[in-house]
From Swiss-Prot:
A single Gene Ontology CC term: mitochondrial inner membrane
Entry similarity comment: Belongs to the cytochrome b family.
Protein encoded by which gene: MT-CYB
UniProt-recorded name of the protein: Cytochrome b
GO molecular function annotations of the record: metal ion binding; ubiquinol-cytochrome-c reductase activity
């Protein structure tokens, strides 16, 4: 028997990454899981080296980030970390989108742990965005943390507790740096839990069949596909890092934080813009905060909203049309979140935010029932 199966340390790894039974018909859309593992490893490694040259003090934080250019290959560490975060979220959205399309959310434990990973990743990215201590970092931290004041009765106290004072200051920066360093390791633990549940539940099949199709071992059939995806992704990331490293950066963040000067337009990174657009679309502060958090937490309840007898969308024509309309709606939300708050963008933002919740709460269960009646009506007659 091979050592990888006998050794108590290697045996769990073998079950998760080598001899894992996998459907024989999965496509390259299943590569995003391995790409996310690559992104997490890259962020942890580059982040550890960057932290060696970072100073979590309001007078030195901005300069210490710029000082990375004087370190050997410091610019590579900095730009791979910054653009790696965007790649992380891009792969994350594709990974979630694939699960929504092929019914991966019906594997409850795997899906729920995945959503927890998504939430913690968003928190980690927000904390990291504050650390350069540029104008957008400072004012983004001020605006986003101030949303906690919408909590009835204790909101103001919670905000001051998060700040460590009466405004965003050195205490805020220090605790944000500590948490930003800690969270990726918690993410790594959750990823292992995610893989364990995946090993128990099994990988989803593109056809959505509950009965096992012809399974093959993960290695070497899918590790080869994963390596191909990893090489292509690293090539594309390298093109961005070497040729246009500041493509996704905000110009305001190249100015040191100044509490006396407010940027013309405060906005988060692109991967938060869909939630930011939903926040802005509600005139009431409390309603906006609740809607923003619900836009993410609603994914927890998505399996409960599934009413179709079919697992995925390949055999559900109406469900497919609704899904692609949701993708367009998501892109519109991201676009609206990057624009100034004025007409006609306000009304457009409210309409696309309304459709976002309409898709999850009404369209998904309604189309499930309609398709059940259309697709299985003849079968019901035969049973009678």
């Amino acid at each position: 028997m091979p050592l990888r199966k006998e050794n108590p340390l290697l045996s769990p790894v073998n079950g998760l990454l080598v001899d894992l039974p996998s459907p024989s018909n999965i496509s390259y859309l299943w590569n995003f899981g391995s790409l996310l593992g690559l992104c997490l490893a890259m962020q942890i490694v580059t982040g550890c080296f960057l932290s060696m040259h970072y100073c979590a003090e309001v007078g030195l934080a901005f300069a210490s980030v710029g000082q990375n250019s004087d370190v050997n290959y410091g610019f590579l560490l900095r730009y791979f970390h910054a653009n790696g975060a965007s790649l992380f979220f891009l792969c994350l959205y594709f990974h979630i989108g694939r699960s929504l399309y092929y019914g991966g959310y019906l594997k409850g434990p795997v899906w729920r742990v995945g959503i927890v990973i998504f939430l913690l990743t968003m928190a980690t990215a927000f904390l990291g965005y504050v650390l350069p201590w540029g104008q957008m970092s400072f004012w983004g931290a001020t605006v986003i943390t101030n949303l906690l004041s919408a909590i009835p009765y204790v909101g103001t106290d919670v905000v001051q507790w998060v700040w460590g004072g009466f405004s965003v200051s050195g205490a805020t920066l220090t605790r944000f740096f500590s948490l930003h360093f800690l969270f990726p390791f918690i993410l790594a633990i959750l990823v292992v839990v995610h893989l364990i549940f995946l090993h128990i539940e099994g990988s989803n099949s593109p056809v959505g069949s509950k009965t096992p199709v012809v399974d093959v071992v993960f290695h070497v059939y899918y590790t080869s596909k994963d390596w191909y995806g990893i090489v292509v992704t690293l090539m594309l990331l390298s093109i961005v890092v070497y040729l246009m490293p500041n493509l996704l950066g905000d110009p305001e963040n190249f100015i040191q934080a100044n509490s006396l000067v407010t940027p013309v337009h405060i906005q988060p990174e692109w991967y938060f813009l869909f939630a930011y657009a939903i926040l802005r679309s509600i005139p009431n502060k409390f309603g906006g905060v609740v809607s923003m958090f619900l836009s993410i937490l609603i994914l927890f309840f998505f399996p409960l909203l599934h009413r179709s007898w079919l697992r995925g969308l390949p055999f559900r024509p109406f469900g497919r049309m609704a899904f692609w309309s949701f993708v367009v709606n998501f892109v519109l939300l991201t676009w609206i979140g990057s624009l100034v708050v004025e007409e006609p963008f306000i009304i457009i933002g409210q309409l696309v935010a309304l459709y976002y919740f309409f898709y999850f709460l009404i369209l998904i269960p309604l189309l499930g029932e309609v398709e059940n009646n259309l697709l299985f009506k003849q079968r019901k007659k035969c049973d009678l």
